Amino acid sequence: MDEHLLQFNKCDVFTPSKIAQLMSEKLKKGGKLLEPAVGTGDLLKFINSHDYDEIDVYDIKEKYLATIEKENINKHLADFVQTEIDKSYDNIILNPPYIRIQDLSPEYREYIKTNFSQLEHGLVDLYYVFLIKCLSLLKEDGIMVAITPNSYLYNKSALALRKYLLTNKYIEEIIDYQ
């Protein structure tokens, strides 16, 4: 495994069933669905794979992809952030990795700095990168449902991300589980 991906072994945060069910209910049926950090498939448990024309899931861990047993799913053993994707999605559901970019390799940080100009420098979290990349793959009338820490709502380092989200009118609803 690449050196910069070793840090991802420390950031597994699984989605509770109750939240996964709520998230899946917010998606619209049909079209293409993306899950960019599938992990053990918690977010897919409440999704009928036959309700979608195509489902793509990504993870860097083969052991997680091996646990996904639903039909009609394209499994990609790849780093979602660094993978070029030439399609757009009607639905995106995600629980991205939560890891400070400063804890990643210098090469990985440089890749992010070069390819994600919407981010400020400083204490940036990898989940910011996942949000931006997912939004770039979302169709204009698409739905993205994400569970994240609420830190991007107030962290100084997330100012550029907040402006990006608000300027492009990406936020329809926020549910805060404090």
Where in this protein do the model-derived segments appear?
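Signature of N6-adenine DNA methyltransferases within the class I
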Residues: 4, 8-26, 34-72, 80-178
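Conserved residues in the N-terminal Rossmann fold of short-chain dehydrogenase/reductase
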Residues: 77
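Nucleotide donor/acceptor-binding cores
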Residues: 31
